[in-house]
Design a protein with these regions (language model features):
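VWA/integrin I-like adhesion module and closely mimicked acidic/polar interface patches used
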Residues: 152-203
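Von Willebrand factor
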Residues: 30-93, 96-142, 144-146, 188-189
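C-terminal motif of bacterial Sec signal peptides marking the signal peptidase cleavage site
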Residues: 17-20
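Short beta-strand-loop
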Residues: 76-110, 198-201
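Bacterial signal peptide processing site
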Residues: 22-24
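P/S/T/G-enriched low-complexity
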Residues: 191-251
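Exposed acidic/Ser/Thr-rich ligand/metal-binding surfaces
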Residues: 119-172
Length: 251
């Protein structure tokens, strides 16, 4: 009996070992991180209200996987900048948005990130985001950084050097955090978008810009009287225009 018990114990241990090493079920959500930065500077005042409403929809759509949007396993939302350059601001985690309606998310965003004449500091934002990702052990998970901003750095430009301020935007802390890192800039002018694409130095980080004129089109995709989970045009518009998969470094 003892040998049989020993064999049975060995088989059970092996089974437990195989169970512990088995991959996650196919229905589980793959790890991926969404970081959003909201511009509260005076230069963004014109687009602030529209941007807050879109950000609330964007978060709601992703958190609920509407229209096939990727569901993030980690979310951090903060402001881009502060009262002075280099000021570190708090990020709100995914728990602050889960279970809320679009209206509730928008109200929270307005409360946490009121429109103020603050300094826009992209480099500090990227650095803080990278620190959070490392602390939360999210390295290697696909990283999506969405900047809801006009993209104007608060750095004076030398005469004739239009790209100078953009060359000072440091995305270095985001490099090598993941095999797939994309920075998406929403609401810039076409000129600012080109300056980001040409002036911001990067290696593995991919950059995607959506002009303010294009962003204005999201409202046209909504069908009155149709619930959000059936707003297929809206979610497809977001997938095609905002979440566009950048396969290579642009410019």
């Amino acid at each position: 009996m003892r040998p049989r018990r020993a064999v049975a114990a060995a088989v059970l241990a092996a089974a437990l070992g195989l169970t512990g090493c088995a991959p996650a079920e196919s229905g589980s959500t793959p790890r991926n991180t969404l970081v959003m930065g909201i511009d509260v500077s005076g230069s963004f005042r014109r687009h602030y209200d529209d941007a807050i409403e879109f950000t609330a929809l964007y978060l709601y759509g992703h958190l609920n996987g509407l229209g096939g949007l990727r569901v993030p396993t980690a979310v951090f939302v903060g402001s881009v900048g502060g009262e002075q350059a280099g000021e570190v601001k708090s990020f709100h985690p995914i728990h602050d948005f889960q279970g809320k309606s679009v209206e509730q998310i928008a109200a929270s965003l307005r409360e946490w990130f009121p429109m103020q004449d603050q300094v826009t500091d992209f480099s500090t934002f990227f650095d803080r985001a990278a620190t959070l990702i490392k602390r939360q052990n999210l390295v290697l998970a696909p990283l999506n950084v969405v900047l809801v901003s006009d993209g104007l750095p608060d750095v004076p430009a030398a005469p004739g050097d239009s790209l100078g301020p953009y060359a000072q935007v440091q995305v270095g802390p985001l490099e090598y955090l993941s095999r797939s890192t994309t920075v998406r800039l929403l609401y810039p002018t076409p000129t600012v978008a080109v300056r980001w694409e040409r002036g911001v130095e990067r290696n593995r980080v991919r950059l995607w810009t959506v002009d303010a004129q294009v962003m204005a089109g999201w409202r046209e995709q909504m069908v009155p009287g149709v619930p959000l989970n059936a707003q297929e045009r809206l979610w497809k518009w977001i997938a095609d225009n905002v979440d566009f998969r950048v396969r290579a470094r642009v410019l």
